[in-house]
């Protein structure tokens, strides 16, 4: 069941990024193969886990399945975090300057992964790698100057500029 939940958890992004967890759960609930091969209770548990996987949900997942997928859905590396936050801000705000995009990315990463961030608080299993990544995020996002330098160096490696 965890594999199915993992496969479905972000499919709803094809429909709507903001409500992707709800859209993904709808897709899972309507999958004829799953309805044929799993009990209605199992389909319900899987759909709820898909709905509950978001770190920004504001509440604990309803099942162990939701906790597993939610915890596994965290960005595993600082590099992936830099890439996603920068690219998303650039896409969302194409008229902002490079420095404004970088600062928005820094703020987002801090809101999500700083010690009091919503994703930092919703890791349901002990994970030394995740904890080390959180410490690194705290270090690099503490000041705009440090973060900007790191992001610009990362972008040079990515884009060759």
What does each model-identified segment do?
Residues 19-35:
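An active-site-proximal "capping" alpha-helix that borders the catalytic cofactor pocket
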Residues 25, 47, 102-106:
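Hydrophobic core segments within long, regular secondary-structure runs in both alpha-
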């Amino acid at each position: 069941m965890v594999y199915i939940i993992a496969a479905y958890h972000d499919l709803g992004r094809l429909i709507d990024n903001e409500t992707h967890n709800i859209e993904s759960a709808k897709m899972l609930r309507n999958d004829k193969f799953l309805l044929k091969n799993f009990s209605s209770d199992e389909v319900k548990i899987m759909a709820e886990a898909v709905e509950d996987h978001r770190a920004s949900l504001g509440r604990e997942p309803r099942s162990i399945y939701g906790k597993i997928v939610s915890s596994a859905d965290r960005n595993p590396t600082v590099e992936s975090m830099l890439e996603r936050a920068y690219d998303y801000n650039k896409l969302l705000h194409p008229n902002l300057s490079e420095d404004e995009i970088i600062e928005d990315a820094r703020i987002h990463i801090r809101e999500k992964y700083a010690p009091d961030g919503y994703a930092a608080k919703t890791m349901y299993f002990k994970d030394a790698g995740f904890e080390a990544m959180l410490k690194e995020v705290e270090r690099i996002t503490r000041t705009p100057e440090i973060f900007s330098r790191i992001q610009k160096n990362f972008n040079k490696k990515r884009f060759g500029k």
